[in-house]
């Protein structure tokens, strides 16, 4: 098989998963570089980069790169492609060529996003792309249009991927295997795919109307022609809120596997409760979107509804957190690096969830909206939730993907550095938010200097951790320590074919013996 046939025209779920992991790693480093520019600007009062336009272009690009080109490709494209077929005993994904197209839509999409920064003044709209700031007066030129096309491609990629995963998971299990016997990671990807399938078309509609408002003189979001900019916010957040659950749900699946494995348990505590909790989170995620819009002047009864509905999500989330703790209980805990990431995830994700409950209160949110309290909240659940889950999964399944083991001491040291860095970066931002420092500004009054400086020092520590990770991966491929014998394969069937598994697995249907 030629290099081009294998890597450009691939129809193999393992190879496509590897492509996604490499692309996501690369994009993650670009997104980290953007975040370091943000923290360099905010490290002390005064100006570093120029005006607020270039600052907001960097903020916007940081968000898009991290969400659409790092977290989603790694979690859904990388881990999803690699593990879902292995975990359900399928020979590949349901639509292998569409799988390849889903991946190859991402590099052009990334290219369009980068292009949007290089023409005119760039898209300094924030990742929400609200009009009228994103309209053709405040953002004349092609920047926002290129960003919109970038989102279109990334969206098509995710929709096709979602169709592929839903079909694969429902249709390609052995007949004897019921949906309630599939591993939790498979469930998490299935629910994530359903969320993508239902939410992305609404985003596509919203940004397409914005595109025609900008270029064809329609007035969907322009009051002068009977439109309403608030409509855009509803359309965007109807996608945007499910999106944040799309980013964390596969992480829930990963953490369930890692915690059970390193606690020496044959399954996570409360399997059915975990499944129903994820289903509930997926459903509730669609009916809370306007909690992002408490400041736009909705009726008090509307705000009361969105406050209560948002708080209800804490219940299934709590079920998951306590089930993970119950899985740990009585286990023989192996303090391997994946377990450290998983425990860090549980602790920090819970803190992020608690600040989320604070923000759910519509009255409190009036004061906290668009302050650094919100930034701190969602970076606790993303930078320490989603990213810690990715690193737990990566350190756990790296031997499966490559056949080589990571250096245990250096991987633990990497966890320590990263844990310190992200907490020093984002914990002080709660104080800044409570003190009223607004988001998306490149400068601030002197009173905010201390916490901003500490936050920026934290970002440099996190950067050190990223460099350590790259070195750790290089070291593993360089030293070529082989995997001797994976453990607990009876309840972790992705490992049964060896490390790494052969190019084709389950070529003949798997034999499934159902427990009585």
Curated annotation (Swiss-Prot):
Membrane topology qualifier: Multi-pass membrane protein
MF GO annotations: cytochrome-c oxidase activity; heme binding; metal ion binding
Amino-acid positions noted as binding O2 in the UniProt annotation, renumbered to this chain: 245
Record-linked CDD domains: Cyt_c_Oxidase_I
Location(s), subcellular: Mitochondrion inner membrane
Positions contributing to Fe(II)-heme a binding: 62, 379
EC code(s) of this entry: 7.1.1.9
Needed co-factor(s): heme; Cu cation
UniProt GO BP: electron transport coupled proton transport; mitochondrial electron transport, cytochrome c to oxygen
Keyword Secreted included in the entry's annotation: no
Binding-site list for Cu cation: 241, 291-292
InterPro entries for this protein: Cyt_c_oxase-like_su1_dom, Cyt_c_oxase-like_su1_sf, Cyt_C_Oxase_1, Cyt_c_Oxase_su1_BS, Cyt_c_oxase_su1_dom
PROSITE patterns, per the entry: COX1, COX1_CUB
Membrane spanning stretches: 13-41, 52-87, 96-118, 142-171, 184-213, 229-262, 271-287, 300-328, 337-358, 372-401, 408-434, 448-479
Reaction equations catalysed: 4 Fe(II)-[cytochrome c] + O2 + 8 H(+)(in) = 4 Fe(III)-[cytochrome c] + 2 H2O + 4 H(+)(out)
Pfam families, per the entry: COX1
Record-listed Mg(2+) binding positions: 369-370
Protein family according to the UniProt entry: Belongs to the heme-copper respiratory oxidase family.
Function: Component of the cytochrome c oxidase, the last enzyme in the mitochondrial electron transport chain which drives oxidative phosphorylation. The respiratory chain contains 3 multisubunit complexes succinate dehydrogenase (complex II, CII), ubiquinol-cytochrome c oxidoreductase (cytochrome b-c1 complex, complex III, CIII) and cytochrome c oxidase (complex IV, CIV), that cooperate to transfer electrons derived from NADH and succinate to molecular oxygen, creating an electrochemical gradient over the inner membrane that drives transmembrane transport and the ATP synthase.
Subunit structure as annotated in this protein's UniProt entry: Component of the cytochrome c oxidase (complex IV, CIV), a multisubunit enzyme composed of 14 subunits. The complex is composed of a catalytic core of 3 subunits MT-CO1, MT-CO2 and MT-CO3, encoded in the mitochondrial DNA, and 11 supernumerary subunits COX4I, COX5A, COX5B, COX6A, COX6B, COX6C, COX7A, COX7B, COX7C, COX8 and NDUFA4, which are encoded in the nuclear genome.
Protein's name according to its UniProt entry: Cytochrome c oxidase subunit 1
């Amino acid at each position: 098989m030629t290099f081009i046939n294998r890597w450009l025209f691939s129809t193999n779920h393992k190879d496509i998963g590897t492509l996604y992991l490499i692309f996501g790693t690369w994009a993650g480093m670009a997104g980290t570089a953007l975040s370091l520019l943000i923290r360099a600007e905010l490290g002390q009062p005064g100006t570093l980069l120029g005006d607020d336009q270039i600052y907001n272009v960097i903020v916007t690009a940081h968000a898009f790169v991290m969400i659409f080109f790092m977290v989603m490709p790694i979690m859904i494209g990388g881990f999803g492609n690699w593990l879902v077929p292995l975990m359900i005993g399928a020979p590949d994904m349901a639509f292998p060529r569409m799988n390849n197209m889903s991946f190859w839509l991402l590099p052009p999409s990334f290219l369009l996003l980068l292009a949007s920064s290089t023409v005119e003044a760039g898209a300094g709209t924030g990742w929400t792309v609200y009009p009228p700031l994103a309209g053709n007066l405040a953002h004349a030129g092609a920047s926002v249009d290129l960003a919109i096309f970038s989102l279109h491609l990334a969206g098509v990629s995710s929709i096709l991927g979602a169709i592929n995963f839903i079909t694969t998971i429902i249709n390609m299990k052995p007949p004897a295997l019921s949906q309630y016997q599939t591993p939790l990671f498979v469930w998490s990807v299935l629910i994530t795919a359903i969320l993508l399938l239902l939410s992305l078309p609404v985003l596509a509609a919203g940004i397409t109307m914005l595109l025609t408002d900008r270029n064809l003189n329609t007035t969907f979001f322009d009051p002068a022609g009977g439109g309403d900019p608030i409509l855009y916010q509803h359309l965007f957040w109807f996608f945007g809120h499910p999106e944040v659950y799309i980013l964390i749900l596969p992480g829930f699946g990963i953490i369930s596997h890692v915690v059970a494995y390193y606690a020496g348990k044959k399954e996570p505590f409360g399997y059915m409760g975990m499944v129903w909790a994820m289903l509930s989170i997926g459903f509730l995620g669609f009916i809370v979107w306007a909690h992002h819009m408490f400041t736009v002047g909705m009726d008090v009864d509307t705000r009361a509804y969105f406050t209560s509905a948002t708080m209800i999500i804490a219940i299934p989330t709590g079920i998951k957190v306590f089930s993970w703790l119950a899985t740990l209980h009585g286990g023989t805990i192996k303090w391997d690096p994946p377990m450290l990431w998983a425990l860090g995830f549980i602790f920090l994700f819970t803190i992020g969830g608690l600040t989320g409950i604070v923000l759910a209160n519509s009255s409190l949110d009036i004061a906290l909206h668009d302050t650094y309290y919100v930034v701190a909240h969602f970076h606790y659940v993303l930078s320490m939730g989603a990213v810690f889950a990715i690193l737990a999964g990566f350190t756990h399944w790296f031997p499966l993907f490559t056949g080589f083991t990571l250096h245990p001491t250096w991987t633990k040291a990497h966890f320590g550095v990263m844990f310190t860095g992200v907490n020093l970066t984002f914990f002080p931002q709660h104080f800044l938010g409570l003190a009223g420092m607004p988001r998306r500004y490149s400068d601030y009054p002197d009173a905010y200097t201390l916490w901003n400086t500490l936050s920026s020092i934290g970002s440099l520590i996190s950067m050190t951790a990223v460099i350590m990770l790259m070195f750790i991966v290089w070291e593993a491929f360089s030293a070529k320590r082989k995997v001797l014998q994976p453990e607990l394969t009876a309840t972790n069937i992705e490992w049964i074919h060896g490390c790494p598994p052969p190019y084709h697995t389950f070529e003949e249907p798997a034999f499934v013996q159902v427990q009585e």
